[in-house]
Regions:
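A short, Trp-centered hydrophobic/proline-enriched beta-strand micro-motif
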Residues: 18-29
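Classical nucleotidyltransferase
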Residues: 30, 44, 52-54, 64
């Protein structure tokens, strides 16, 4: 499994947003610290300055907002700072 830097992850998220590509994201849940897997979600919005990302489920259009720092893996690539 390949590891990428946090800024490269931001570039990949931005490219997925521009090309409407599906992403596979593992992220921590803020309240409990549990790891949640978002498989095949679309990037709905990216807020670079606020540090948040919004993902949308293409099947039921559910939206999830998460801090970018909580993402630990994207498209089978680990994230390091």
């Amino acid at each position: 499994m390949k590891a990428i830097h946090f800024t490269e992850m931001l570039r990949q998220i931005d490219q997925a947003y521009q090309h409407r590509a599906l992403v596979d994201v593992y992220a921590y849940k803020g309240e409990t610290g549990a790891i949640i897997h978002y498989r095949g979600w679309l990037v709905h919005h990216v807020a670079w300055r606020q540090g948040f990302i919004r993902l949308r489920n293409p099947k039921n259009r559910e939206l999830r907002t998460m801090p970018q720092i909580f993402i630990i893996q994207i498209n089978n690539q680990k994230i390091y700072l």
